[in-house]
Regions:
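Mid/C-terminal beta-alpha module of Rossmann-like enzyme folds, strongest
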Residues: 215, 222-264, 268-271
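N-terminal Rossmann NAD(P)H-binding glycine-rich loop of SDR-like oxidoreductase domains
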Residues: 4-23
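Catalytic helix-loop patch of NAD(P)-dependent Rossmann-fold dehydrogenases
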Residues: 81, 96, 105-168
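NAD(P)-dependent short-chain dehydrogenase/reductase
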Residues: 134-141, 151, 156-204
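N-terminal Rossmann-fold cofactor-binding loop
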Residues: 29-37, 48
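NAD(P)H-binding glycine-rich loop region in Rossmannoid oxidoreductase-like domains
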Residues: 45-85, 91
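C-terminal amphipathic/interface module of NAD(P)-dependent oxidoreductases
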Residues: 252, 267-295
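Alpha-helical substrate-binding/gating segment
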Residues: 184-195, 204-230
Length: 295
């Protein structure tokens, strides 16, 4: 069987990818602090900020393909430099690279963003992910206002151009077996009699984790290179999505209250809905709307 390396294999998406890919691939998955055991797959501890260790692992395993899901909300260098190291190592061993990105590379001013729309992130995480996209493929447009700093600009200028890579921008990942962290928080809060405020003016395109993983694995075997949006077909506010989840799980929806992002002090994009026409035409994997799965 062909060999597949998945970074961030102990994360929510990474674990699902390992579980699904091991049927058709010899899989190695990496972790940093959260070591987990997944039968019929091999694990490796890896700090992707350590370039030499990244290159060593790639040369030892020599993967045919790589899915890069590892990231950190707390250390943005993991996103920027870590992605650069993974892209360099993938190129060095001739591996196909699938890089996971986010709808947060957009400012959320209008929604239904296409792959060729210029990223304009408004918070540090989105800016780091936009820079990471450029490190994977310099054909990705990026407004100059999103530059992190002069050092980051020099990193971009010397970045690897991985022409065989695909960049998958996605949205809110959710699932019930196991639950994603947001759903688990909602369940725990409502079961304890608490109240949870969810924004009515912040829109995303939630995608079921199993279907996202299936789409990514399908993409591995295609010749597609460049950016592709893989997200749910339904634009939903966080409030609407939370209510649907609570009803499906038999929870007390009265504990969910509407809130307004614009009245908070948070700097967050309001409407990051993604146009997924390209993915619908390219992939056989069907992506369901939450309203279908939670009915």
């Amino acid at each position: 069987m062909k060999r597949l390396l998945i970074t961030g294999g102990s994360g929510y998406l990474g674990r699902k990818l390992v579980q699904m890919a091991r049927r058709d691939w010899t899989v190695v998955y990496t972790y940093l602090n959260n070591q987990i055991d997944i039968p019929r797959a091999m694990s490796a501890s890896l700090d992707i900020l350590d370039r030499d260790k990244v290159l060593r692992l790639f040369h030892n395993f020599c993967p045919h393909a790589v899915i890069h899901t590892a990231y950190s909300q707390d250390n943005l260098e993991v996103i920027i430099q870590g992605t650069k190291h993974v892209a360099e190592a993938s190129e060095a061993v001739g591996a196909r690279l699938i890089h996971l990105s986010t709808d947060a590379v957009f400012d959320g001013a209008r929604g239904w963003y296409r792959e060729d729309d210029t990223p304009l992130p408004i918070h540090p995480y989105g800016k780091a992910k936009a820079e990471a996209e450029r490190l994977v493929n310099c054909s990705v447009p990026l407004a100059t206002t999103t530059r992190l700093n002069k050092n980051a600009e020099s990193q971009v200028a010397t970045a690897l151009v991985n022409r065989s890579a695909a960049i998958v921008r996605t949205s809110l990942m959710w699932g019930l077996e196991p639950m994603d962290s947001r759903t688990l928080h909602l369940v725990n809060c409502l079961n304890e009699g608490g109240r949870l405020a969810l924004f009515t003016d912040e829109y995303r395109c939630p995608i079921y984790i199993d279907e996202l993983a299936s789409a990514i694995l399908e993409l591995l075997n295609l010749d597609f290179c460049g950016i592709i949006h893989v997200a749910g077909p339904e634009r939903m506010s966080r409030y609407e999505f939370g209510l649907d989840l609570a009803r499906k799980l038999g929870l007390n929806i009265n504990g969910i209250t509407p809130g307004l992002s614009r009245l908070s002090e948070l700097v967050r994009p309001k409407d990051c809905s993604l146009d997924t026409s390209l993915a619908r035409g390219l992939l056989k994997t069907r992506i369901s709307a939450p309203s279908e799965l939670l009915a």
